[in-house]
């Protein structure tokens, strides 16, 4: 006899609740969490859902599905806010405001464990010794700053393995972007002084650097060292040019300016990053919002989702007054290790920055709405062209990339009704096939992808698009049949005889195996081309990455008995791999730590076993 669950009685449940702070989870009959919320008083907050007061349409709809409520009691409201954010990120409930893009922001990293520190791009957890500068709104902003640092201060950015094996300066020294510390062209003291100036620049103290360089320029001129004086002059001019381009005239300090606009269906949040008065740029988000959510509600949810779990600056300037603004500040202060002030009422410079953020958010939302309208038009055209019973909600496209069979990579890109869904993109490193066999590569990639989906790990597409002709489509048909994947419409897109855009042929997987051509200006074809081209781009990027890894791997790593220290000794002794490959046994054996037997192994590896 099976147990029949008791019907949920909200009144009885509310009577059992505590008045302490905590987090509540609304759960449906299947055990799926519909909504996560936090409360200063759990009893009052949960009870408010079941009063006769008027509620938004989305809350009314959600309550018709609630079969259980789970609660977690916390010590403080700030602690509840942090837990709420953690659960929303983990469970992604459908009635909460969710961030689509939660990728970590990039930073500039300055190592501190070497005599000649290195500057580099970093994204991810910040661990290990050294200093971190940022965050920056994009990888482009980091690379632009690194490029400026390299031009002005000539700090090395090469990998440690490259640095430790140089016998002569590299190209960066020749183009005056590095002082070649690898071969002793600059003293440790002089290099550290350049590093100190670079740090001052990253901290927003360029004026101090300019003053110091100006004093050195004058001193060099007095000593009649005109070449050195000219170098200082060039650095000063480069820094002044950067100041003109990046600095905001007015207040200093670290803060983010966050603005939210919504049309009731789509919301846009833009975040501007200011560090030491310098505008580092902005990032735009389009959070998924429940129907009827207002701008203040969206902004409050965004701030919690985005900032809890990452270090916030001391000040957040926001476009709307939000509920429990003080509690959010307390939670962020705890997370960040310093006081975080969340404010809406600002004047002067900050008011201008906030207006700028709002203007950008409005423009971005308008552009997004226009793009969505075009995407919907193309989807409707595709539905009509393929005679589909419903509008396709998800399209997946596969492509293969390799160089004469080397480093074969298959790529899968995903589009939904909003465009590319990059969080669902996947790459597959293809192994165990005959090099260059595209059919086998496609078969392997599709099998790996849809075996997972059959296990419930993901969502099946409405349309599976294959970049290829009848042969590739046949491979896809075989895989889908073998895995018993139904209700997926298979389409191949084959290039025309001249491989010109607009001349593609569609290979359809219906009973007749029809071929179909659309006009070059047909919206349906333009959509398929966009998806196909994105798969092509994603596949090529993955292939180049794999090929680069394989080709930069030292051939010495394949020689038994030749560990990292001995490999390094060989490279130092000969100055590079090419010289090692050309060396004879006797020359190899003269390297410190290399026996004659090991030298013979190295020689045989490059020249073949003569025995």
UniProtKB/Swiss-Prot annotation:
Keywords: Cytoplasm, DNA damage, DNA excision, DNA repair, Excision nuclease, SOS response
SUPFAM superfamilies found in the cross-reference section: C-terminal UvrC-binding domain of UvrB (SSF46600), GIY-YIG endonuclease (SSF82771), RuvA domain 2-like (SSF47781)
Pfam families named in the record: GIY-YIG, HHH_5, UVR, UvrC_RNaseH, UvrC_RNaseH_dom
Example GO BP: nucleotide-excision repair
Subcellular location: Cytoplasm
PROSITE patterns per record: GIY_YIG, UVR, UVRC
Record-annotated UVR domain positions: 207-242
Domain GIY-YIG: 19-97
First-listed, main subcellular location of the protein, grouped into a coarse class: cytoplasm
The protein's role, per its UniProt record: The UvrABC repair system catalyzes the recognition and processing of DNA lesions. UvrC both incises the 5' and 3' sides of the lesion. The N-terminal half is responsible for the 3' incision and the C-terminal half is responsible for the 5' incision.
Subunit: Interacts with UvrB in an incision complex.
Family: Belongs to the UvrC family.
Protein name as catalogued: UvrABC system protein C
Gene: uvrC
